[in-house]
Amino acid sequence: MATVIERNFFRLLRAGLFSSRETIEPLSPWKWRRLYQLSLVHGVSETIWHGIQVCQDDYFVGLISPELKEKWSKTIVKTKEPDEDTEEAMGLTNPLLDRKLQAIIDQESSLEETPTRLLLVAIVNNTRAILNEGINLPLLMEMAQMLRQPAGTIDFEKLQSWISRLRLQPMADLLGTLNVMLLGFREAEVPFMKKNLEKTATQLTEELFNLNDGSTDEWYFTQKDDEIFVRTHNSRAMFWHVGHSARFSRLYPSEALTNFFKSFANSLTHIEE
């Protein structure tokens, strides 16, 4: 069950992302500081600060200390705006699937840039992020903003055909569920979502707020000159990634396996001679 900090975190995130009024629950000064820290960790402090401005008439928002408000306004970590990096697909590690992806992108790139193509890129990039690290909130927010474009902007029939070609349906279902659970979407607003994966989405969300887990950034290996064996830089991170990859092998088996071995190989390149 989500804590009051987590509930307010996503309420303010939605308020900042869509300029929508939300009802905020009371927080102690310590819990407001914790929410502030979480916004920094996940790169969404600017969006949540905007949400605070949108909800400034809410009684409990008015109880945020002036000191924290001043600190927040001065230490905003600006959420990265969509640019060439975020509008290009990260690519898939499975060679067969990646060739299919690049063929779709190349075909669409020869035409006028379309929101449908950009949404596919967002789905792929969010998928890669989830396979490697878990939920990436800035990427998920970009996807949410695309979904909130005026009706008819996105060709969901074409998008669905691409999702099927890339075997992305289970991951598309998961991303749709995250948009429904965390960002206030109705299922009807996410036409490519065929199944609600609430259990998996809940587990991912819990990991989002568990800052003690390792990540692939820490999953490197070192080797001393007088040793035969290599050691992991962070064994907790390694075991987390093994378990994380195993969980998603059922949702995207053709990509999860190759992604795991690519991450493993990348970690070995960090061996210190």
Regions found by a protein language model. Name each.
Residues 1-273:
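Conserved NTP-donor binding/palm subdomain of two-metal-ion nucleotidyltransferases/polymerases, i.e.
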